[in-house]
Amino acid sequence: MIKYILGIVIFIAIVLVAITIGANNDQIITFNYIVAESQFQLSSLVAILFGLGLILGWLITAFFYIKLKLKNMALARQVKRQTLQINELTTTRDKVV
């Protein structure tokens, strides 16, 4: 519960900082990208680039998280299979003795 409250507080702090920065940066700048050129307000450009960075970070994190989850599931299956084999071997050994 504390983790969620802390996350909400951090999110609100980031939003407040973004609003403050956006309110103070209203100048128009020219943004050149590979295909074209556009004019943006500095605050809008910062918000767009921040959002793209956030989305890219989440996608990269999700990729590695899913990769680790799949590896964890495979290892759990392997442990279960080996546990069954050990139990089977000890059962057959006990029957022989």
From Swiss-Prot:
The chain crosses the membrane at residues 1-21, 46-66. Involved in the assembly of lipopolysaccharide (LPS). GO terms for biological process: lipopolysaccharide metabolic process. GO terms for cellular component: plasma membrane. InterPro entries: LapA, LapA_dom. HAMAP family: LPS_assembly_LapA (MF_01948). The keyword NADP does not apply. Belongs to the LapA family. The lineage of its organism: Bacteria, Pseudomonadati, Pseudomonadota, Gammaproteobacteria, Pasteurellales. Residues 67-95 form a coiled coil. It is found in: Cell inner membrane. It is a multi-pass membrane protein. It comes from the Bacteria. Keywords: Cell inner membrane, Cell membrane, Coiled coil, Membrane, Transmembrane, Transmembrane helix. This is Probable lipopolysaccharide assembly protein A. The keyword Hydrolase does not apply. The gene is lapA. Its main location: membrane. It holds the Pfam family LapA_dom. It comes from Haemophilus influenzae (strain ATCC 51907 / DSM 11121 / KW20 / Rd).
